Amino acid sequence: MTEQAAKPKGWFKRALEKYDNFIKEWGLDQPNCSCVPMSATEDENGNLKKKESSLKK
């Protein structure tokens, strides 16, 4: 098992981790009401920033 831990992750495993992080960051992994839309804006680097709807208060 130590040989596998030292091996770098393949592109698929890295992509899967990024997808999992995205799902957790946006709260899509939890069952909740999807009737309240969320909007996203881009920062100066072009990355999406999460911005919750004003209706969700």
UniProtKB/Swiss-Prot annotation:
This is Uncharacterized protein HI_1257. InterPro entries: DUF5363. Pfam families: DUF5363. It comes from the Bacteria.
